[in-house]
A protein has these predicted regions:
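Structural recognition of beta-strand segments within beta-rich domains
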Residues: 15-20, 26, 32-35, 41-43
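Extracytoplasmic beta-rich repeat domains
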Residues: 2-25, 53-83, 108-125, 148-171, ...
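Beta-propeller domains
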Residues: 35-57
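Short loop/turn segments that connect beta-strands within beta-propeller blades
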Residues: 44-47, 102-105, 142-146, 187-191
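Structural signature of WD-repeat beta-propellers
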Residues: 35, 93-94, 133-134, 178-179
Length: 225
């Protein structure tokens, strides 16, 4: 199979010194991508031509950054990648906001604060938007208004990796992984646990040895995970 590059673009100033994973979102004829400084750009999928862009407001930080991972002056930048669902572009920020934008023109529909930094791209289904934050809390928001519908909290170990699992919604059930080594299935309607499965057991003498984070996206294949 011969593969050729049709087009390529750099989004804004890239990621800078930030340790974040920003996968783009794809919907219809749009590819939506973010940089590490609050810029979100929608490109034509076939030509690479910019269609619209949004720049999120900057927030002044006090104190010093840790190991240069954050700049002193940072926008509320997209921290978990770009999600697509319910006819919207869905992003979470380092300042604990979930923002819903119109796919066609990038206009903001709503934004809701969910607490801490959003660690993965939001997903949507059955009239709700689901988001997971770095404190291992899953929040369900009303897709029309952004109002909080329910939350689910998982007990975190003392030491974890930076990052979270990306929730996946399928047939009324939300699947996601947590820093305690468990994968959990939640009812999309109310957040009630259906089942949980430990995929790794913590072993070792130190907290570092005992890290068992599930940080990857859950993959579903028919009746298997």
């Amino acid at each position: 199979m011969d593969v050729s590059v049709q087009w390529k673009r750099q989004v804004g100033d890239g990621l800078g010194k930030k340790y974040i994973r920003l996968m783009p979102g794809v919907v219809a004829d749009r590819i939506i991508a973010a940089d590490g400084y609050g810029l979100l750009v929608a490109y034509d999928r076939f030509t690479g031509k910019p269609v619209w862009q949004q720049q999120f407001d900057a927030i002044e930080r006090s104190g010093f950054s840790i190991a240069g991972l954050l700049d002193r002056r940072d926008p509320a930048f997209v921290s978990g990648g770009v999600g697509i669902g319910a006819g919207m572009v869905l992003v979470g920020t380092t300042h604990g906001e979930v923002i819903a934008l119109d796919v066609a023109d990038g206009s903001e529909r709503w934004r809701t604060r969910v607490g801490t930094e959003v660690g993965a791209a939001p997903t949507a289904g059955a009239g709700k938007v689901f988001v997971q934050t770095i404190d291992d809390r899953v929040s369900a928001l009303d897709a029309d208004s952004g109002d909080l519908v329910w939350t689910y909290d998982s007990q975190m170990p003392l030491l974890t990796l930076r990052g979270t699992s990306a929730p996946v919604f399928d047939q009324g059930v939300l699947y996601t992984g947590f820093a305690n080594g468990k994968v959990v299935a939640l009812r999309g309607e109310n957040g009630e646990p259906i089942w949980e499965q430990r995929v790794m057991l913590p072993e070792g003498r130190s907290e570092l040895d005992r890290i068992v984070d599930v940080d990857a996206r859950v993959l579903l294949d028919g009746g298997s995970m």
